[in-house]
Amino acid sequence: MLRLAARYADVINTGYPPDDHAQQRAALDAACADVGRDPATLPVTVPVWIAFPDLGRIPDHMKESTQPSAEAVADLFRAYDRAGVAHIMVDLQPNTPASLARLAEALNLYRSP
């Protein structure tokens, strides 16, 4: 699959946590080398589930994705940034104005120096 992505993809979506990303990126880089592609031309995206249990009910499948604070989410985003992830897609629960406000706070913290 990585070889197909290396040859044809404009972007590759993975599901690895930040700590596993370096190993997975190395495998992708090797696949790029095999097909003569510069690995820098194949950005990686990840889906990230973020759940704030203090703001409402969380679906069972997201129980392990809970975050205690906006700072914790900002730290998670920083870890993906350090790992070289180009784009994060967020699934936020509960889907409420309060959760969106906390996500906005996390993004502001992530972007601050």
Q: Predicted regions: what is each one?
A:
Residues 1-113:
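Active-site-adjacent structural elements that line small-molecule/cofactor binding pockets in enzymes
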